[in-house]
């Protein structure tokens, strides 16, 4: 759950950054209303139970409601939607408006079966994007912690040049406290 909360808290901090841009023609105080965070869990039995425990804390998911079948038909996925005003940081501490967290619109799709990453991407693009009709889509893997304004800079690349069809950000290794992570050869390289 630490990887999930690290990523989710970073996304929520980025949404707060969008809302802090008071002189922007696009963003500002209510900028959060233009952003929807979609999370896909690839397989109900595959997702770690402690990750699922983080969702009710944010109000997005209720355990025990999802059923494997309805009227004899297999269920493919369960979709939950909520506008949360609470974040869990990587230390599993609650953060809210007092720490600069703004409301975040969330869609959580819990797939019954693990069908791998490409199927999850297709699920997002086919099922949600046709309804949401976004101008920009940013994909993040669990464990990636975006910098406080990195999603804004990715969005800005699309906003300033309509010919941009894709963009990627820079990935930096988390070095840990006192750079202790550098003792790990994978981090150090």
Swiss-Prot record:
One Pfam family cited in the UniProt record for this chain: Chitin_synth_1
Cysteine pairings via disulfide bonds: none
Membrane topology: Multi-pass membrane protein
Primary location class: membrane
A molecular function (GO) term: chitin synthase activity
Top EC class of this enzyme: transferase
Record-level GO BP terms: cell wall organization; chitin biosynthetic process
Top-level taxon: Eukaryota
Subcellular location: Cell membrane
InterPro entries on file: Chitin_synth (IPR004835), Chitin_synth_fun (IPR004834)
Keywords assigned: Cell membrane, Cell wall biogenesis/degradation, Glycosyltransferase, Membrane, Transferase, Transmembrane
Catalyzed chemical reaction(s): [(1->4)-N-acetyl-beta-D-glucosaminyl](n) + UDP-N-acetyl-alpha-D-glucosamine = [(1->4)-N-acetyl-beta-D-glucosaminyl](n+1) + UDP + H(+)
One GO CC term on file: cell septum
Enzyme Commission number, as recorded: 2.4.1.16
Family, similarity comment: Belongs to the chitin synthase family.
Function per UniProt: Polymerizes chitin, a structural polymer of the cell wall and septum, by transferring the sugar moiety of UDP-GlcNAc to the non-reducing end of the growing chitin polymer.
Protein name, per record: Chitin synthase 1
């Amino acid at each position: 759950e630490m990887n999930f909360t690290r990523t989710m808290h970073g996304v929520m901090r980025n949404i707060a950054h969008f809302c802090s841009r008071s002189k922007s023609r696009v963003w500002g105080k209510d900028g959060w209303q233009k952003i929807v965070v979609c999370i896909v869990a690839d397989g109900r039995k595959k997702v770690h139970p402690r990750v699922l425990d983080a969702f009710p804390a944010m109000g997005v998911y209720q355990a025990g409601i999802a059923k494997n079948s309805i009227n004899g038909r297999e269920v493919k996925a369960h979709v939950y939607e909520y506008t949360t005003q609470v974040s869990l940081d990587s230390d599993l501490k609650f953060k809210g408006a007092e720490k600069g967290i703004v409301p975040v619109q969330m869609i959580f799709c819990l797939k019954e079966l693990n069908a791998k990453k490409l199927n999850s991407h297709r699920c997002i693009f086919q099922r949600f994007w046709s309804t949401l009709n976004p101008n920009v889509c940013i994909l993040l893997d669990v464990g990636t912690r975006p910098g406080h304004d990195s999603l804004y800079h990715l969005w800005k690349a699309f906003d300033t040049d309509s010919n941009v069809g894709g963009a990627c950000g820079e990935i930096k290794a988390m070095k840990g406290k006192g750079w202790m992570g550098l003792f790990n050869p994978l981090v150090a390289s």
